Curated annotation (Swiss-Prot):
One of its GO terms (molecular function) is phospholipase inhibitor activity. InterPro entries: ApoC-1_sf, ApoC-I. GO terms for biological process: lipid transport; lipoprotein metabolic process; negative regulation of cholesterol transport; negative regulation of lipid catabolic process; negative regulation of very-low-density lipoprotein particle clearance; triglyceride metabolic process; very-low-density lipoprotein particle clearance. GO terms for cellular component: high-density lipoprotein particle; very-low-density lipoprotein particle. It is found in: Secreted. Residues 1-24 form the signal peptide. The keyword NADP does not apply. Belongs to the apolipoprotein C1 family. This is Apolipoprotein C-I, acidic form. Pfam families: ApoC-I. Gene3D superfamilies: Apolipoprotein C-I.
């Protein structure tokens, strides 16, 4: 009898509480919007970085330095041979 009464109290409390609002249900479209925004931001940052590298003098100077060093090594090897 005591078990029956305690179960009845639990069931009544659940029924009287009513349906709970869906608070933690993630919205899939919102997740995709956030992911799309992140992708666009990343794309813009990468494009800006690549443009910065291609417009700077560093690649040209590096290429010239390697060419000059390679030419000097070739000349030294020719002289020694």
């Amino acid at each position: 009898m005591r078990l029956f009464l305690s179960l009845l109290v639990v069931v009544l409390s659940i029924v009287l509480e009513g349906p709970t609002p869906a608070q933690g249900v993630p919205d899939v479209s919102n997740s995709f919007d956030v992911l799309e925004g992140f992708g666009k931001t990343l794309e813009d940052n990468v494009r800006e970085f690549i443009n910065l590298i291609t417009q700077s003098e560093l690649p040209a100077k590096t290429r010239d330095w390697f060419s000059e060093t390679f030419r000097k090594v070739k000349e030294k090897l020719k002289i020694n041979s």
